[in-house]
């Protein structure tokens, strides 16, 4: 067994590999970019070496630098994680030539399966069913358009070297083909260095089911059953579960055996995933093989009682697989939710910022937990960030993977809902509320699964903002007034003096004040804020809002956790303050309320309109309009790239482009004006 390995990755997967290596007594070496100098993966490894600037092309994608670090630190093997160089056959080959063990499949297997088009050809030869499409070398746009017309719309374009939902476009009609192809190729070259694409018939209600396979150097190959990854947005997985709901033993065996056959056909070694598109009628088609560990591997670990990273290390060291096919039974049900820094209500745009507060449910991390030979821990959280860390525009905005296990799917669903309610993040937008709606929605609960689930249930998954309840406003008001009291006391020479505090104490009278909090609901209704009238009493307050009056008192407090009594109702909640923003977590919901301090913004003028601004930091990759051009509402004007995903800024109304302020290739800051626009 190895005594030291280098982990050629960052974030959650680097921490995941380090955890298993540590448990096995193996020393670890981390590599990091300048942006990651204070990152968690740097802290958890035994050694860490800087390899370059923030841009992945100058750091995590520099195989020669990584190999040099491995040799200099005495590492015997390199674990690539997922993403970056994990499916780069040239890197795997270079490791072997340098005398390092690449913890993954042989370069030949990666080349065979790494190209989607080559893999499709290979599977066709092996009589594995394929979705109708074009997987050849010809990349002329006119030729590809003719192939798309032949296949029939809707057509799915995919980067041949791609993965993770990047470089994919669904095209509904022929008129949209050329623009979608150009965008797909730009994203493909940016993400994978290869703009080759393939085209396939897009199935309207398919399920995405993948099989975890594992092979060793002794001729053994097994499947560790399936994962259902049908719930996706932008072709990226949101929820994954194992086993797949409604999967019969016969179909499971058929898909598992097909996956093993695919792995054996390319002389596979190590962990791999064979992905299938499954139709509602039970038929399935080969989609691709990922020649690495998957993001969602924990759900397989939880139902099979295995540590897949340990398996990777043992197989790479030349040992046989720890279990046979007969020993790989399914126990219980596991679900994984990917918690991202993103705004689902704004097209899942990434959210850049600092994790000012992060409260999580009680959970194990990077392990099965539970008791040896017994059930695994009910909740697991795999995360590569900590409170205080920044989510930057350079890398994937994942905050954590939340994994739950239950004796059956019903119990797992209940545990997921509860765990999401206990996740509290302040500092940037997240998809937690969206995930909670998704998990609790009737479609997912009833296992009515397919890759269009999110779009089909958009009305319930993306509801319009609702008014904050009086209880949430009361909790914010109490937190505000308590913080004022503490500030006043800290500045007073005699904190007990009623004349020197902010308790609202007045001689012979009850002090009254107005508080104003605003949220997204206020903005959609044209309201400036929720107005709360507060009257200070001897043992609490009386509040009035929206024609409702109620007595209010603070019954208990521990840090940011408040217990209040509002009228006859007792309530509990956590309130985290971030400048003028009060984040109220109560009843499994998160209310972001901005306090409109009457003194803080006195004299400020409203900024002049007429400019379209960048929704996030990123790079301008295309300017589709020109100065002086008249445009229609919805016309694409500028395309930005952030985190290797493209985002189109469109005209908000009919109007005139008066000036363009950035050129292709320019980096722009969040909120930077991109162009001057005059509405008609």
Per-range role (PLM):
Residues 1-274, 278-297:
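N-terminal beta-alpha lobe that positions the nucleotide/phosphoryl donor
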Residues 87-94, 336, 346, 449-450, ...:
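Structured, non-catalytic alpha/beta "coupling" segments that mediate domain-domain communication
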Residues 168-170, 201, 247, 398-407, ...:
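Short, well-ordered beta-strand elements within core beta-sheets of diverse protein domains
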Residues 259, 298-549, 670-676:
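Catalytic cores of soluble metabolic enzymes centered on carboxylation/carboxyl-transfer
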Residues 323-331, 455-458, 462, 589-614:
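Long, charged amphipathic helices and adjacent flexible linkers at domain junctions
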Residues 602-680:
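Structured functional modules or segments
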